[in-house]
Amino acid sequence: MLENWSTVYDLEKIINDIFILHKNNNNKKFSTNILISGKSGIGKTQILDQICKKNNLKLKVVQAYQYGEFITGLPLVNNDITKFTKAEWVQEVLDENPDVIMFDDAHLIRSEYLNHFYETLTFRIFQSTQLNKNSIFVLIGNWGIDAAFFNDIPLPIMSRMNYIFKFEPNLNKWIEWGLNNNIDKRIINYLSYFKDEFIINSDVNEIVISPRNWEYFSEALKNGLQLDYFDTCLGVKIGNKFKDFLLVLDKSLDELLTLAKDKNLKESEKIAIIVALGNYDNAYKNKSITDYISSLNDDRIVLWITIISQKYKMEDNYKEILEFKKYIQKQFPSIYEVYNK
């Protein structure tokens, strides 16, 4: 499986196809320039990195601020003659001869350097230095409503793009990626129900939450982040909600089933009970658990089924997955068809 976060369309497949078309374009009459735009922290850079690795393509990442700040290189004075070294990134590109050159955070290229950038995109020339004409150029950035108040992409640059993509992360794909990349299981379990919290804008929460936040939060949890500091990663509202969720997960089976009778539970605590019962060993074979789950509405039952499925996938326990599917088909036939898909 390709390890990345996917878009609402299959972006990795499309870019793979573009790379193949470029490779088969023997005369290279036209350069291949790709623009991938979207909000910060949603995995634009990672998806390109993983696609290049999958296709054994050498990738060179150029940070956009380097393009402007080092456009002339460093001055070398010899008597009365001053020459300039090649910009550092240009020399690296010449030395490494990459298949793909990615300009990360391309919206940071200062407007006074856009003419030079246009020349680079069109002719693969930078300050009279010829770059590899066969290299694919990929611009990664945030434009339009995602611009974060930096430069909008001007029309001449846009006209040089052969392919333009608006990147939107997909939670289901991210969860699939997370199961294979050691994202904390409790985060995956939480987002399996609270799907609207995968991405949150600042007008809803004190801080913007993106897939990158959840990835950083996962690392912080593994490194022993204390409960009192959850709000530094997720904001006060979501941080406290996740804290309530987490505290329930550590309870014993008897404590969980007793707590489930409490009429004053918060929503996050109710969901945590279902998650904890899903992660219990042989959960679907335990009558006290299945009796409680059977009393719930369908969306809560689906969550419980999802948690058990995720657990078996992480364990590579395919034998148990098959047995569990048989159980669902027998006990919840109306849900089985959706689950099986």
Predicted regions and their residues:
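C-terminal regulatory/interaction module of P-loop NTP-utilizing enzymes
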Residues: 1-101, 105-341
